[in-house]
Amino acid sequence: MKKTFYHYMMKHRAALFSNEISNLAEAMYDDLSFPKQSEDYDEISSYLELSGMLASMSIFDEAWELYIQDR
């Protein structure tokens, strides 16, 4: 069974050293409206852009690449 992007990102929460990806994971966890069941890049990217959760979408792109490599 494939992990959703949300499920993958939860392993980055509570990192020993905070970084942009761990901060994104925390923000996703705190956002009750985040599309938790999605595996779709466009859906998640659009959601993040509209929510203003990130200062730069390059953080999401980096996290997405890690997600794809881990699948």
Curated annotation (Swiss-Prot):
Transmembrane segments: none annotated. SUPFAM superfamilies: YozE-like. Pfam families: YozE_SAM_like. InterPro entries: UPF0346 (IPR010673), YozE_SAM-like (IPR023089), YozE_SAM-like_sf (IPR036806). Gene3D superfamilies: YozE SAM-like (1.10.150.260). Belongs to the UPF0346 family. This is UPF0346 protein BCE_2336. It comes from Bacillus cereus (strain ATCC 10987 / NRS 248). The lineage of its organism: Bacteria, Bacillati, Bacillota, Bacilli, Bacillales.
